[in-house]
Amino acid sequence: MAETAPLRVQLIAKTDFLAPPDVPWTTDADGGPALVEFAGRACYQSWSKPNPKTATNAGYLRHIIDVGHFSVLEHASVSFYITGISRSCTHELIRHRHFSYSQLSQRYVPEKDSRVVVPPGMEDDADLRHILTEAADAARATYSELLAKLEAKFADQPNAILRRKQARQAARAVLPNATETRIVVTGNYRAWRHFIAMRASEHADVEIRRLAIECLRQLAAVAPAVFADFEVTTLADGTEVATSPLATEA
């Protein structure tokens, strides 16, 4: 029976910052938040911190977000390695064009033992889960049968890598949308804020909403001042949403 895959989001990279030694400025933050502040102050050469309300990094970044000076947020980035996510969910994810992606290739990686991601609407129903996993098993059996026949069909292809690729890219047509995929996603702070505003909404599909909220929690640990305006709440159905009055970019 097909194994199910839980969502897992792992932080794998974040911006470092090296302050220029010839600039008369210090800050109480490091990494991406420090870089964002530096970029903002570079616009106005406000190294002396003339405004007490923006003298701290948190105060400065909150002001940046309040006034909509979002371009400076684009200098700092975070990368996640995401597993336990369905192919149907990544079809929505990759519509966010300001991110960079590197995704598992079904042309090079065989899917005979691929896991499935249970849609949120089926998680609490054993009968529905059983129907789903049976369908996934049938699809994988058909995939394996097609793969064997396609490899035989392309047996005259002398390049073994190309032969297997040709077979897999045709056989994958029968794999379900619930098939697990794995993907590296990199985005700058502005892009992540936009993603969360769009996909942590109650109007988003629950699977990608869960992804957005888990990313938000980890982003808030990396750059609290940049993401602190988002509030996570629970709806009547038990699912979570995240909203912010300052997330103004549609």
Swiss-Prot record:
Active site residues of this protein: 199 (involved in ionization of n3 of dump, leading to its activation)
Disruption phenotype: Cells lacking this gene display impaired growth. Strains with a thyX deletion could not be obtained.
Reported effect, residue 95 to A/D: Loss of catalytic activity since it is not able to complement an E.coli thyA deletion mutant
Gene Ontology terms describing biological process: dTMP biosynthetic process; dTTP biosynthetic process; methylation
Keywords associated with the record: FAD, Flavoprotein, Methyltransferase, NADP, Nucleotide biosynthesis, Transferase
Control of this protein's activity: Is potently inhibited by 5-fluoro-2'-deoxyuridine 5'-monophosphate (FdUMP), but in contrast to ThyA, is not inhibited by the folate-based 1843U89. A 5-alkynyl dUMP analog has been shown to highly inhibit ThyX (IC(50) value of 0.91 uM), while lacking activity against the classical mycobacterial thymidylate synthase ThyA, and therefore is a selective mycobacterial FDTS inhibitor.
Cofactors demanded by this protein: FAD
Domain ThyX: 7-233
Keyword Methyltransferase among record annotations: yes
Assigned protein family: Belongs to the thymidylate synthase ThyX family.
Protein known as: Flavin-dependent thymidylate synthase
Organism: Mycobacterium tuberculosis (strain ATCC 25618 / H37Rv)
